[in-house]
């Protein structure tokens, strides 16, 4: 990669897809299914194992450092759960690697001579010491490259101790089997990267293997897979707790709403009972008022009839007394007139008739006035 391409990639990684206003690059978002989620989390095997004996070639999905920068910015604000996709990808890759390791072990078991369990255990011990020496040498070289010379020297001293143990283990292994068989190269399969390791490999060969890009790449992938499994488990546990808390809150709200609804119904019922009670009271009051008004009307009518009856009775009695008085007075006048007529002799009949008419008219007028 040229220096210009490296600078461009660095700018993409730092500033994202919108670093220079290129709209064509912004058409593909990091959430697109075509984007490699393992690349966004910096654990894609196609990137890690590039340039090794197990180079996988170019990934079928989009790899873009700018999209990774966009994802890192967005993941600080909300959880996108891309770890689950990356974990599935790495699990399938590691499962394939483990399958190749088992096949290599079967081929070695078929091609190499059968040895006893005791000899096999001694050979396995030599392999383990070789692996430890190779890891320590690789670590010492890494520390020396970083400038930690003192730490590197300490690790080299540990390497010398392990070499002494390895020499003793090789002597035990050599003495436990014939010389012809011992000279035969005994191989084993690396449990990390499925590469072949020899029992008699020198330290340089072991350091190159355990410090090589292939072995370290597989270590990185396996460690990243363990980290993703732990992260996914924690997030799933957190999500389950959040879901449980939301469900409890929802149930509590439903209980509160049911309680408030029952209280509302009780209040409605009490209000309806109060309305019915007030309505019945008002109805009874209306009825009592109506009955009292009816009784007062009956009493008033009765009193009116009584007063009218008494007034009629008094008027009739007054009429009867007036008639009786008038008849007595008339009788007395007639008697007095008859007595006077008998004393005076026969009067003039015309005068008598006129006087009688006048007297009768006066009596009628008087009677009418009294009535």
UniProtKB/Swiss-Prot annotation:
One of its GO terms (biological process) is negative regulation of striated muscle tissue development. Residues 232-371 are annotated as: Disordered. Residues 258-317 have a biased composition (Basic residues). Disulfide bonds: none annotated. Ubiquitous. It comes from the Eukaryota. May bind to RNA via its Arg/Ser-rich domain. It comes from Homo sapiens (Human). The keyword Transmembrane helix does not apply. The lineage of its organism: Eukaryota, Metazoa, Chordata, Craniata, Vertebrata. This is Putative RNA-binding protein Luc7-like 1. Keywords: Coiled coil, Phosphoprotein. The gene is LUC7L. Residues 232-257, 318-351, 361-371 have a biased composition (Basic and acidic residues).
């Amino acid at each position: 990669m040229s220096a210009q391409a490296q600078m461009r990639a660095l700018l993409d990684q730092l500033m994202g897809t919108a670093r220079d206003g290129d709209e064509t690059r912004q058409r593909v978002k990091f959430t697109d299914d075509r984007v490699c989620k393992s690349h966004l989390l910096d654990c894609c095997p196609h990137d890690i194992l590039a340039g090794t004996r197990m180079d996988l070639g170019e990934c079928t999905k989009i790899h873009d450092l700018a999209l990774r920068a966009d994802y890192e910015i967005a993941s600080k604000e909300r959880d996108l759960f891309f770890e689950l996709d990356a974990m599935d990808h790495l699990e399938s890759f590691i499962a394939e690697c483990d399958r190749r390791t088992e096949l290599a072990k079967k081929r070695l078991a078929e091609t190499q001579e059968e040895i006893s369990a005791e000899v096999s255990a001694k050979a396995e011990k030599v392999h383990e010491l070789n692996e430890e020496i190779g890891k320590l040498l690789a670590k010492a070289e890494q520390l020396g490259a970083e400038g930690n010379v003192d730490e590197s020297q300490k690790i080299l001293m540990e390497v010398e101790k392990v070499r002494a143990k390895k020499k003793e283990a090789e002597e035990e292994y050599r003495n436990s089997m014939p010389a012809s068989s011992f000279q035969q190269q005994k191989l084993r399969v690396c449990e990390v990267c499925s590469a072949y390791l020899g029992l008699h490999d020198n330290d340089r060969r072991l350091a190159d293997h355990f410090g090589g890009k292939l072995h370290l790449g597989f270590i990185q992938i396996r460690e990243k897979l363990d980290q993703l499994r732990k992260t996914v488990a924690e997030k799933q546990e957190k999500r389950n707790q959040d879901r449980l808390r939301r469900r409890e809150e929802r149930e509590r709200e439903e209980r509160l709403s049911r309680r408030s609804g029952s209280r509302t119904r009780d209040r409605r019922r009490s209000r309806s009972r109060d309305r019915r009670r007030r309505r019945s009271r008002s109805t009874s009051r209306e009825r009592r008022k109506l009955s009292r008004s009816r009784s007062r009307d009956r009493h008033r009518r009765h009193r009116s009839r009584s007063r009218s009856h008494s007034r009629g009775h008094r008027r009739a009695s007054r009429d009867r007394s007036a008639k009786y008085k008038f008849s007595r007075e008339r009788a007395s006048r007639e008697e007095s007139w008859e007595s006077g007529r008998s004393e005076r002799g026969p009067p003039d009949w015309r005068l008598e008739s006129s006087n009688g008419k006048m007297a009768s008219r006066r009596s009628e007028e008087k009677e009418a006035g009294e009535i």
